[in-house]
């Protein structure tokens, strides 16, 4: 072993090595530790050259051709691996993003489903939800409304669409998440009605709704987003949307079989409307669009609606010769209907808040079956309406002019003020809505006897209904709807011989001290009613009013909501009652319901009921 000289790092004194002793300076006593130095031996040959040095030439290594060939292959494999990995990650992300909701989560939507399927407190099944074909959800008058049908309106033009209104005040404070509608897998029509109370969801898809043919967007919903909702855009036939750019407008061309289009909002920068002629549109609805020149190219249109327009050039309407339905609302620069002469197939005309100076172009128009004039301005109708002999529906509201006699042999549905009734001869009339709020705020039931086929009567606005007993001579009259109506012949009203459904909203009844008796009426609604007993004070306390209705022994359903009802003792004789709507009252005791053998549904939300357990388990309680 070779040794090196050691000097003390402190005093520089010479340190001598002694076997098995630590290194210690003899001068300052500093101890030193040495780390063993391990030596590695390398077996190698060293060539020594003598003489004149040769030129310094660096030898090149041989090029490895296999390695050069393999490098790009490895790079390609790495790239493909990265691409496949990224694709899988993207696919997984999309799968997560497109995961759909199989059961609604909002309480209000679940309540609606439980009710229409008679589930009581049980959750609806996926199969039941999938059976709904048509669904429209909207928030109106602080209440949720659901229009629904179990029939497909695309295959059954007569599909019955029912309306369900939520009465619970707490439920009506809630919003519905758009993603909840993913659970309705059997829908062909989904309408979110541009409603603000429906919260949009970031990750929503309706691609699994394979039969969806019609969609109405929610509030301010981007069409760029809506366009991705459908797995097969060729199935879509109806859209109600907003358009904010020409690029969004161009997306409509991806829906080759689109037949009906409603543009509920269009941004000012949108101008490329002429591309719509590439679609086979049959129905078009526009709002707040002032340039209508491009309409001339849509010669196959059968239905057109224009709402709020400052347009001044209406010549394109002359080209719409196939039009069957036309609705114009607040198109204030339109003064004449000359273009109507080019619409020989027109069946329905709806004019609201218009400044038309005359309607002569409508005279003797045999194709017209439906006419609605709402606040038509200063136009004079006179005998024009009488010349429309094919009319089946007529609505005249907000019109203060005069009319001549109207003979309408085919008219089945009419809406007009009571002063026009003496001039209306319509022997086939079945549905009549009458306004009695003007100077002649009275309607005599005897005036209705000339409509022997009348089935439904609706009386609107504040007025007096007299001659009620005459209605017994109308054998088909089964439904009466009354709004803000005053009655002095109340006993006659509640003893009508043929009426099975009576709806009274904000009605005032004058009665004597004798309770009513009725064994014909099946459905009764009383909302915000008042009763004057004899010549005494008007009574609004519901518990004093309801004993007068104890003799309605044939009732199947009864509705009294948003009131102060406390006692249910009055309905002890209602042995046929099946459905009670008593939401938002002050009921605490339901003992009187125990002996009602046919009671199936009880709506009692908003009441402080203390003894609900006494009711039969078969009664569905909401």
Region roles according to the model:
Residues 14-18, 34-35:
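Short, non-ligating residues that shape and space the ligands of small metal-coordination modules
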Residues 181-184, 203-206, 230, 252, ...:
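Hydrophobic anchor residues at the C-terminal helix/turn of individual leucine-rich repeat
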Residues 3-5, 22:
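Residues immediately within or flanking Cys/His clusters that coordinate Zn2+
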Residues 8-11, 25-28:
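Short cysteine-rich clusters marking metal-coordination/redox-active sites
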Residues 28-39:
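Short Cys/His-rich micro-motifs in 6-15 aa windows
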Residues 92-123, 139:
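Surface-exposed cap/linker segments adjacent to membranes
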Residues 134-180, 186-205, 211-226, 235-248, ...:
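Concave beta-strand-loop units of leucine-rich repeat
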Residues 60-89:
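Alpha-helical transmembrane anchor segments and their immediate juxtamembrane flanks
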